Amino acid sequence: MEIRYTDKRDFTEKQAEDLFLSVDWASGKHPEQLYKALMNCETVFTAWDGKRLIGLANAIDDGGMTAYVHYLLVHPDYQGSGIGRELTEMMKRRYKDFLYLFLVAENPPLVGYYEGLGFTKQDGTSVMSINKR
């Protein structure tokens, strides 16, 4: 298998929806909004196996100081093959001159995974949100 990585946003709404649903992420249930968000954020990197979208990472940033990796996902058929690591490294290179690169690890196994990629837990912080759905 030869995986191709790109920063081109040449995926369809359906491809994004299918990838997000493959990992049971609620964003996949809102394909129009998801696609709009991915088309309008600052950075998107994708991973492809032929014409199949198998991985995606996106980030939003303030232009110079802080970037937030919002999505990082790999299709279950391809997890464990280094795709998430490569997408993360692409983000780290893209934002190497920023002071902060943040992400949210939503479960304990992900904390260890991201620590292995150079991220550190921030003591005394809590993720907070206003959810409309």
Q: Where in this protein do the model-derived segments appear?
A:
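Short alpha-helical
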Residues: F11, G64, P108-P109
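A short helix-loop-beta-strand connector motif used in the catalytic cores of GNAT acetyltransferases and
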Residues: Y35-T46, Y100
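Conserved beta-strand in the GNAT
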Residues: T46, R52-D61, Y68-L73
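Conserved beta-strand-loop-alpha-helix junction that forms the acyl-donor binding cleft
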Residues: F102-G112, S129-R133
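Conserved acetyl-CoA pyrophosphate-binding loop and the N-cap/start of the following alpha-helix
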Residues: Y78, G82-L87
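Conserved GNAT acetyl-CoA-binding A-motif
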Residues: T88, R93-E106
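Conserved acetyl-CoA-binding loop of GNAT-fold acetyltransferases
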Residues: L117-G124
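Short amphipathic alpha-helix that is part of the acyltransferase structural core
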Residues: M1-K29, T125-S126
